[in-house]
Curated annotation (Swiss-Prot):
Gene coding for it: Rhno1
Organism: Mus musculus (Mouse)
Residue spans of biased composition, Polar residues class: 96-106
Pfam assignment, any one: RHINO
Location of this chain's protein in the cell: Nucleus; Chromosome
Chain span(s) of sequence motif RAD1-binding motif: 54-60
InterPro entries, alphabetized: RHNO1
Chain ranges for the short sequence motif KEN box as given in the UniProt record: 171-175
Transmembrane segments: none
GO biological process: cellular response to ionizing radiation; DNA damage checkpoint signaling; double-strand break repair via alternative nonhomologous end joining; protein localization to site of double-strand break
Record PTM Phosphoserine, positions in chain: 50
Biased composition (Basic and acidic residues): 161-173
Name assigned to this protein: RAD9, HUS1, RAD1-interacting nuclear orphan protein 1
GO molecular function: chromatin-protein adaptor activity
Region described as Disordered: spans on this chain: 75-106, 111-130, 149-198
Amino acid sequence: MPPKKRRRQSQKAQLLFHQQPLEGPKHHYESCQQPITHTVQVPSKPIDQSTVTSWVSPQFDRAAESRFLIHWKPHRDQARRPTRRSTCKFPRLTFESPQSSSSETLLLSNRVQPQNSEKDPPRRPLVPLFSPQSCGELSVHVPHSLPHVFAPPDIQTPDSSVRDDPISPDQKENSFPSCILGPGTPSSPEPGPVLVKDTPEEKYGIKVTWRRRRHLFAYLKEKGKLDGSQFLVKI
C-alpha cells in the first residue's frame, strides 16, 4: 500500500508582532494617506434601470442569454446516445448538360441501351459519320501532334455522297486521318539535333581522354612512352 499523502495547510497563519509600530502603519510605495477632514454632501437621485440601458442595441444585451447558459448542463445519457443519421432535407440538385455534337449523342445512345435484351436481334454498332464540314471543325480542336493514328472501322456514308463522288475503300481509309489531323501535319516527325556523335570503329577500346587528345596520343604512341594498359579500356 502506498503511504497516504499528508494534507498541508493552504492558508498560513498571519504573523504576530509583539510590538506595534510607533508612528503608525508606514507606506513604502506611496505617500501617507492623510485623514479626511472636509466632507461635502451631494444630493443623489434614484436611478431607473429600464432607462439606463435603453440606448444599448439588443444584439449586445446578453444578460438574458447568460442566465440560460449558467443553468444548462449536458446530461450523461445524452452524451452516450449515438448520433442518428439525419436525412437530407434539401432537394437534389439538377445539372443541365451542355449541347453536345451529333457524334457524341450517337455514342452515348449506344451505351445507354440495356444489356439484357436477348430477344432483340443483333444490331451493328453506331459509328459517327464525318462530313467534310465536320472534318474541318475537328481539325481545329484536335491537336496537330498526335502520337499514333487508329484506322477507322467501316464507315457508313450517306447514299447522296456515294452517287456524287464514288470513292474506293482504300481512299476512305487514307482520307479519314487526314481530315482529323489537318492538311499541314507532317507524316513522320523530323529528327532532332545530334547530341553525341558515334565513335568510329578504329577508336573502339580507347579511353575517352585519349580520344580527345589525338595529337598527343599519336606522338606518345610513336615514341613508345604509352603502354597498352594506359590508353586501352579494360574489359
